[in-house]
Swiss-Prot record:
Manner of cofactor binding, per the entry note: Binds 2 manganese ions per subunit.
Gene name of this polypeptide: gpmI
Cofactor (UniProt): Mn(2+)
Binding residue positions for Mn(2+) 2: 14, 64, 445-446
Residues given in the record as substrate binding sites: 125, 155-156, 187, 193, 263-266, 337
This protein's name: 2,3-bisphosphoglycerate-independent phosphoglycerate mutase
Organism: Yersinia enterocolitica serotype O:8 / biotype 1B (strain NCTC 13174 / 8081)
Amino acid sequence: MSSTKKPLVLTILDGYGHREEQQDNAILNAKTPVMDRLWQQQPHTLIAASGLDVGLPDGQMGNSEVGHVNLGAGRIVYQDLTRLDKEIKDGDFFTNPTLTAAVDKAVKAGKAVHIMGLLSAGGVHSHEDHILAMVELAAKRGATAIYLHAFLDGRDTPPRSAEPSLKRFTEKFAALGKGRIASIIGRYYAMDRDNRWDRVQLAYDLLTQAKGEFTADNAVVGLQAAYARNENDEFVKPTVIQAAGEPDAAMNDGDALIFMNFRADRARQITRTFVNADFDGFKRDKVVNFGDFIMLTEYAADIKVACAYPPASLENTFGEWLMKHDKTQLRISETEKYAHVTFFYNGGVEEPFKGEDRILINSPKVATYDLQPEMSSAELTEKLVGAIASGKYDVIICNYPNGDMVGHTGDYDAAVKAVETLDNCIEQVVAAVQAVDGQLLITADHGNAEQMRDPATGQAHTAHTSLPVPLIYVGNKEVKAVEGGKLSDIAPTMLSLMEMEIPQEMTGKPLFIVE
């Protein structure tokens, strides 16, 4: 057997959806001679990346975490959002032992119950329906001091869409006759994932000390003041919500804190700030010794606090199956999507499999990626091309974040530039794969950059879409594309192209049939 391997490369263009209409479509309007040529000349198909096809509620847009879990699992994986919706509908949520024990302990000790999370109907990191259920659970179990610390979205939802959510919760607390919204802050600060500790510190001080740059009598007034300062939801500066005569809602020893985000990647940093004894991201002026800190789902295996909904383990994901067959694999991306091609792709497993190498390219340190739409794609491509040529790997899995990260800024011109940058990168990847007689699949995890304006509101469209994504084959086999596929069909497709057995746990089907 030759020691030089001919790799199968999976290139995931994050946020690169397929939409026929040209209006506000940064992908269709960009100059993409390489992708155009591949689409015309190579076997290709469109695959579903949203809703029930990826284990989300019907019609729910896809996202990167969900996309990569399905890509790696080779079966539809029912997501936390769907699981939690069902728990609430069936009533089981209200008897969850972890949540009820934390609330009961705080009530018994006369302490407050703090609930924090992304107050959004976006369904990507959280859902406000779950937060509402948590408020109801706390109230039903006798909590009177119930404080909601609302992180505002504007990224997976329109840029200025928080007001109805804040009104809904203000009315809910009024109806209960207990509890209130205690603070609002944009997710840019509270949910950073790129070690920008100066941002996280502003959120931490707001939550622990009720200390913010701004104060308002109620949440809607606080939000409107932020809009007047030209801050969209995502960027709302720390605002304490406290009417005259109300006690402050700072977090104190013995209080319960329940973090209602279900997606891990943007929940980890702020969680570590609260719970790590050796935390050194910044100097914490106040360290709170909570009665309980509960994470809704497991944000990381090394965060040692209680978890209301631990992960269900996935057997025989693509990466694990490769390991069992002594195959070598490489995962490579920038900071922004590194967790996706490793942790999420491996079904929530943090440790690399035997034979799995990883390369992390630092994303550029800019405030928002419209300022540098090419991101770190040149360095990423250089490393990827080198890995393809090395002969070391049977499989290489790469994610280019540009379409998604620049799409999220809502800046159309920057998104076009991002897409044109990707086209140049793909040209180099195709050449590298062909030079070693390897195989290449090009796809996406969900859409974004193909819809840069919301036709209903006229606002910039910063969220993902529920549109299909492309799947293109470039390689040395004569193959025929199958229609009607979805993300969970990609792992079986790859195994089939490698002429490997498909494990029974993978219920997806190959989308390229060798002729």
